[in-house]
């Protein structure tokens, strides 16, 4: 990896982390918050980011060349979104979050098998193991929720969906040699926005009312707009830079685990410094392990 690669990767760590900060600000300050409405807003502004970044060079005429990738990305995103929400409803949250984090293994393994990424060194494999341990420690808590077959299915949906989001993006860059990147993401995010809008509109029961109230509140409270706008732009930047790293032949075994480990470290740091949150011993240990894995992954 070159100095430029490391600079891009570091910028991705920060752009990925600030998305969580903006989300927290929104959910703390919104009178009637809706995760689906907020996600829809961020996706729309991520789409706008790609429109702006591609101004003057966008060409949708060869859409059939990248449409399969866009459909796969949107399907994976929708699968992950539905899986994560249903897993929360039907089983333990912490365990679901832990297994969900294992989705980073999918682009790592498929990157080696399908995309021709180099086999990670023993040190990087050790870094990946330490990262998984740190995620396990971070989510170590007793929960009363019972594990059911449905919960396992929904967790698997989340893992597979998240993993294939990352892999599909990398595959599009690799197999189409960096062409149609903006067009691919604009089409993908438009499809994702449609999926989220359908979830918000056609959801059943109390959730539908919460989403409707959340949407109206979001429109009325202009002070909340900035969080969705900034998070969406940061999301767009994150995706664009990840695609740049793939185009520069940085392997998935470095990109995804590094972003996960760095995100863990920066998120804990932000929680302590910005929100004065008290951290349990498990979180402190997880923070330290995340820092160690970050170093090992980039040796």
How should each PLM-predicted stretch be described?
Residues 1-299:
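Polytopic alpha-helical membrane proteins, predominantly small-molecule transporters/carriers
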């Amino acid at each position: 990896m070159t100095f430029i690669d490391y600079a891009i990767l570091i910028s991705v760590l920060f752009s990925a982390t600030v998305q969580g900060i903006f989300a927290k600000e929104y959910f703390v300050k919104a009178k009637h918050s809706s995760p689906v409405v907020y996600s829809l807003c961020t996706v729309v502004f991520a789409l706008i980011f790609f429109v702006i970044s591609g101004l003057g060079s966008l060409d949708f005429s060869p859409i059939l060349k990248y449409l399969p990738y866009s459909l796969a990305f949107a399907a994976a995103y929708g699968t992950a979104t539905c899986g994560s929400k249903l897993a929360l409803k039907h089983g333990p949250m912490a365990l679901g979050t832990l297994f969900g984090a294992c989705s980073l293994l999918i682009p790592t393994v498929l990157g080696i098998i399908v995309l021709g990424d180099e086999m990670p060194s023993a040190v990087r494999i050790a870094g990946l193991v330490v990262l998984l341990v740190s995620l396990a420690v971070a989510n170590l808590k007793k929960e009363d929720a019972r594990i059911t077959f449905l919960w396992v299915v929904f967790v698997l949906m989340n893992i597979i969906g998240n993993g294939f989001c990352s892999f599909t993006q990398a595959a599009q860059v690799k197999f189409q040699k960096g062409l149609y990147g903006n067009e691919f993401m604009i089409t993908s995010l438009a499809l994702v926005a449609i999926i989220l809008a359908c979830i918000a509109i056609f959801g059943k029961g109390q959730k539908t009312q919460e989403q409707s109230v959340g949407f109206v509140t979001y429109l009325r409270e202009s002070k909340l707009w900035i969080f969705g706008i900034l998070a969406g732009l940061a999301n767009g930047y994150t995706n664009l830079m990840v695609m740049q790293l793939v185009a520069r032949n940085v392997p998935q075994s470095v990109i995804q685990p590094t972003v996960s480990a760095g995100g863990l470290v920066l998120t804990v740091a932000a929680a302590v410094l910005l929100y004065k949150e008290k951290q349990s011993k498990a979180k402190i240990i997880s923070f330290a392990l995340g820092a160690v894995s970050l170093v090992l992954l980039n040796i």
